[in-house]
């Protein structure tokens, strides 16, 4: 499979299929620092990034905002002192789409 970071998000309509259990098992191995959470019955990807201070956390948040705009796919972001919690899911299908895994992998690249 092509590296997730090399892929582009595709338009996700309300009738787009959610990832299957088999796809989930394969894709989650490609982003090992991410976990799967279920909130209000909606499966989501989540990761907490740690930083030395609020300024670094905010700089990461701003880079993530730019990436989200470029890909037209937007996460939940909670920025706090020393950490940023990022949550990816596809709002239109109320669950996980391949786009969410692509964006999780690209989010990890922002640390470099």
From Swiss-Prot:
Belongs to the pterin-4-alpha-carbinolamine dehydratase family. Keywords: Lyase. HAMAP family: Pterin_4_alpha (MF_00434). Pfam families: Pterin_4a. This is Putative pterin-4-alpha-carbinolamine dehydratase. Its EC number is 4.2.1.96. GO terms for biological process: tetrahydrobiopterin biosynthetic process. Coiled coil: none annotated. GO terms for molecular function: 4-alpha-hydroxytetrahydrobiopterin dehydratase activity. InterPro entries: PCD_sf, Pterin-4-alpha-carb_dehyd, Pterin_deHydtase. Gene3D superfamilies: Transcriptional coactivator/pterin dehydratase. The lineage of its organism: Bacteria, Pseudomonadati, Pseudomonadota, Gammaproteobacteria, Alteromonadales. It is an enzyme of class 4 (lyase). It comes from Shewanella oneidensis (strain ATCC 700550 / JCM 31522 / CIP 106686 / LMG 19005 / NCIMB 14063 / MR-1).
